[in-house]
Amino acid sequence: MRKAIIAGNWKMNKTIDEAVKMVEELKPLVKDATCDVVVCPTFVCLDAVKKAVAGSNIKVAAQNMHFEESGAFTGEVAPGMLEAMGIDYVVLGHSERREYFNETDEALNKKVKKAFEHNITPILCCGESLEQRENGTTNKVIEAQIKADIAGLTNEQVEKLVIAYEPIWAIGTGKTATDEQANETIKAIRAMVAEMYGSESAEKTRIQYGGSVKPNTIKAQMEMSDIDGALVGGASLVPADFAAIVNY
C-alpha cells in the first residue's frame, strides 16, 4: 500500500518571518495526519523552516536545484548544499520551470539522479498543455517527459521517486481535470514507469495530482485508485486550507 504524500508548493511567496509563522500555525493542525506532509518554501526560507518544523511530522522540500556540485553557476543552488541543510525532497521540472526557465528533460534527468545521490527524494513534475489535452496527445507528451526524465535510475530509486502529474492548463486557472481524467492519466504514467522498470517497482512509485487542488476537491481525488496525493499550489499558502487538504 502506497502512503499518500501531500506537498504544498509555495512558489515565490512568503518572507522568512511569514514562512516560519505559517509552519508554526500548521504544525498543530496536521500533527495527526496519516499522509506524508511536505512544505516547499523558497531557497531563502529553507533553513528557517527546517528549524521551525524540527520534531514535527512536516518535511521540507526545495523548489529546484542545479545538477552540478559547485562552480560558476551564478544564482544556482547545489544539491550538496540542500543535503547539508537536511532537506528531504526537491520539486523538479515544475511546468513553470519548464516554461519560463527553459528546463529540458536532459537537465531534469541529471537533477533527478543527483538528488538521489544526495539522499533527497525528487518530486518530479510532468503534464500537458490544454492544446495537447484537446488534440489527444496527453499520453504521448507525458511519455516523452517520463522516458527522458527517469532514464538510468535503479529500481530502488524508482520506488522512492514521487511523480506529480500536473496538467498545465489546470495550474492557477481554477480549472481542474476531472477526478477520472486525473486518475486515468496517472494510471497511464504508472504503466510507463512499469514499462521501464517493471510493475513491482511502478506499484511502489507514488504519483500525485497537482492542478488547482482545494479543500473541497481533495477527498474525491484521494478516493481514486491511482492518485497517491497532491502537489498543492495556492491553497498551501493558508494554514487552515492546507491542513484541510492534508486531513482529507
UniProtKB/Swiss-Prot annotation:
Q: Which keywords accompany this UniProt record?
A: Cytoplasm, Gluconeogenesis, Glycolysis, Isomerase
Instruction: Check the record and name the InterPro entries matching this protein.
Output: Aldolase_TIM (IPR013785), TIM_sf (IPR035990), TrioseP_Isoase_bac/euk (IPR022896), Triosephosphate_isomerase (IPR000652), Triosephosphate_isomerase_AS (IPR020861)
Give the EC number(s) listed in the UniProt record. 5.3.1.1
Pathway assignment: Carbohydrate biosynthesis; gluconeogenesis; Carbohydrate degradation; glycolysis; D-glyceraldehyde 3-phosphate from glycerone phosphate: step 1/1
Q: Does the keyword Protein biosynthesis apply?
A: no
Question: GO terms for CC?
Answer: cytosol
BP terms from Gene Ontology: gluconeogenesis; glyceraldehyde-3-phosphate biosynthetic process; glycerol catabolic process; glycolytic process
How this chain assembles, per its entry, is: Homodimer.
Give the family this protein belongs to, as stated in its UniProt record.
Belongs to the triosephosphate isomerase family.
Function statement: Involved in the gluconeogenesis. Catalyzes stereospecifically the conversion of dihydroxyacetone phosphate (DHAP) to D-glyceraldehyde-3-phosphate (G3P).
For this entry, the protein name equals: Triosephosphate isomerase
Species source reads Clostridium beijerinckii (strain ATCC 51743 / NCIMB 8052) (Clostridium acetobutylicum)
